[in-house]
A protein has these predicted regions:
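Generic hydrophobic-segment detector
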Residues: 54-55, 113
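Flexible mid-to-C-terminal extensions adjoining Fe-S/redox cofactors in radical SAM and related proteins
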Residues: 74-165
Length: 165
């Protein structure tokens, strides 16, 4: 990993502070992660797939027609087929066969009892996949925990500001 959890935490806090300050001045800027947290606070699903808690059904198509289940999994072992030679039904059958989405539903036991799980939801599969044998806790778990502790009160302030709009 080139980005350590400590550096990621530092980035989250620094970017959040800038985002929060702008929002409190009435000049809220869009930041995908933070704005998705606002959606979640408002009872809506996040639009970012890495914040859903499970992988969604999507396909990435390369120029040569190769199809993969995610842009982070464009590896031979996850290749679902090729649009030049396979039907969509065959490609979808392969997705089901490898269980790509189903595997992403696995939740670590520690995650189930974490007070931030409803915001974190385990994060993107790619950050859980290679960290442990199989899909376990997110590599950046500690960074997210400390970020949520830090940002939670201010996130509520931005939420109230946006709702009053």
């Amino acid at each position: 990993w080139s980005l350590t959890p400590e550096r990621f935490e530092q980035y989250l806090k620094t970017a959040f502070d800038c985002w929060h300050q702008d929002a409190m001045r009435g000049k809220k800027r869009y930041h995908r992660y933070f704005d998705n947290l606002l959606l979640m606070l408002n009872g809506q699903p996040p639009e970012a797939c890495g914040m859903l808690g499970t992988c969604g059904m999507q396909y990435v198509v390369e120029a040569d027609g190769s199809v993969y289940p995610c842009d982070f999994y464009m590896l031979d072992q996850y290749k679902l087929g090729n649009l030049n030679t396979d039907t969509l039904a065959q490609i979808d059958a392969r997705r089901k066969e490898i269980g790509f989405i189903e595997q992403s539903c696995a939740v670590d036991e520690k995650c189930k009892i974490c007070k931030w799980y409803q915001l974190c939801r385990g994060g993107c599969r790619r950050d859980r996949d290679y960290y442990q044998d199989g899909i376990g806790r997110n590599y950046y778990c500690a960074a997210y925990e400390r970020f949520f502790e830090y940002a939670w009160p201010k996130l509520g302030e931005v939420y109230e500001e946006v709702i009053r709009g």
